[in-house]
Curated annotation (Swiss-Prot):
The keyword Metal-binding does not apply. This is UPF0060 membrane protein SAV_4756. The lineage of its organism: Bacteria, Bacillati, Actinomycetota, Actinomycetes, Kitasatosporales. InterPro entries: UPF0060. Belongs to the UPF0060 family. Keywords: Cell membrane, Membrane, Transmembrane, Transmembrane helix.
Length: 112
C-alpha cells in the first residue's frame, strides 16, 4: 500500500509540475497571457508541496526518483497536449529513467 501511495504522489507531482511548466510555456511562448503564466506558477507551487507528502524522509532520494517520473510524464504530456510523437529512443530513455526511479525508491534497504 505504501508503494501505491508513493506512486500516486509521484503522478500528482508530475501533473502539477509538468502542467505548471506547460502553462507558463503557453503564456510566454504562445503569447496566451499572464493568466496562463499565473496559473502555471501556482501549479508549480503545489508541485513543491505535493513532493513533501512522500513517505520516505530523504529529500535527495525523493527528488532523484521523481526525476524518472518527470521524464516519462513530460513525454506523455507532450503526446496528449501537443501531439508530440516520441521516437523509440525517447521511449527507451523514459523506460530507463523509470527503471532507475524504481531502484532508487523501492529497492529493499537493510535497516534504512
Amino acid at each position: 500500500m505504501l508503494v501505491l501511495r508513493s506512486a500516486a504522489l509521484f503522478v500528482a507531482a508530475a501533473l502539477f509540475e509538468i502542467g505548471g511548466a506547460w502553462l507558463v510555456w503557453q503564456g510566454v511562448r504562445e503569447h496566451r497571457g499572464w493568466l496562463w503564466i499565473g496559473a502555471g506558477v501556482m501549479a508549480l507551487g503545489v508541485y513543491g508541496f505535493v513532493a513533501t507528502l512522500q513517505p520516505d524522509a530523504e529529500f535527495g532520494r525523493i527528488l532523484a526518483a521523481y526525476g524518472g517520473v518527470f521524464v516519462a510524464g513530460s513525454l506523455a504530456w507532450g503526446m496528449v497536449a501537443d501531439g508530440y510523437r516520441p521516437d523509440r529512443w525517447d521511449v527507451t530513455g523514459a523506460l530507463i529513467c523509470l527503471a532507475g526511479m524504481t531502484v532508487i525508491m523501492y529497492a529493499p534497504r537493510g535497516g534504512n
